[in-house]
């Protein structure tokens, strides 16, 4: 049986009971779908189970996370933070976080590094949204001020902060650069060989 859209997924999950939830795959929505609203609704209903992070354009629904629409990714995280905090959910463990990408023209490990960075950027930007001011703007129906608050956070360059966090954790300041300098791909090929079998599973 095919699940046609998020509404059908929510219906099935509701019928199956409290342990059944919906998975939101960012690439599997109609063009211009309000995914952040879908996320908010599923959270309100207690039926959001997790994510497949990716991006989509034309017929490709498994592009690098944040490569096409990073603003929407930020808005999704804004809804997640607000909704999860209201329900006292643990950001790290209470939802399933997965990257679902198909690496046809990129090194898959480099693509994963870029995807993780995009997720961290959107999450950090959403964390610095002035939630109290945004709530006040909403209560006053002040759409202009709400937009200003969201876009001020979105336009804040949090990459130096993330680099500092990596450095303090003993990780690379520039993961892609270090990956290339250390010839990680070459070493993995040497270790695993060049003969691979793709099963499609």
Where does each model-flagged region fall?
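Histidine-acidic metal/acid-base catalytic patches
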Residues: 1-201
């Amino acid at each position: 049986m095919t699940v046609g859209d998020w509404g059908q997924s929510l219906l099935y999950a509701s019928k199956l009971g409290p342990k059944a939830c919906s998975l939101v795959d960012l690439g599997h929505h109609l063009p211009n779908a309000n995914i952040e609203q879908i996320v908010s609704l599923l959270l309100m209903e207690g039926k959001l189970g997790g994510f497949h992070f990716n991006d989509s354009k034309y017929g490709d629904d498994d592009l690098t996370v944040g490569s096409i629409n990073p603003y929407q990714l930020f808005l999704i995280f804004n809804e997640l933070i607000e909704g999860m905090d209201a329900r006292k959910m643990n950001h790290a463990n209470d939802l399933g976080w997965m990257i679902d990408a198909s690496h046809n023209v990129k090194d898959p490990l480099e693509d994963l590094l870029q995807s993780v960075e995009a997720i961290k950027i959107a999450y950090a930007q959403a964390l610095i949204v002035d939630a109290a001011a945004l709530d006040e703007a909403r209560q006053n129906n002040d759409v202009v001020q709400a937009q200003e608050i969201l876009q001020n956070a979105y336009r804040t360059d949090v990459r130096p902060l993330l680099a500092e966090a990596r450095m303090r954790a003993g990780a690379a300041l520039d993961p892609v650069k270090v990956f290339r300098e250390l010839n990680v791909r070459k070493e993995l090929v040497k270790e695993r060989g060049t003969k691979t079998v793709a099963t499609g599973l």
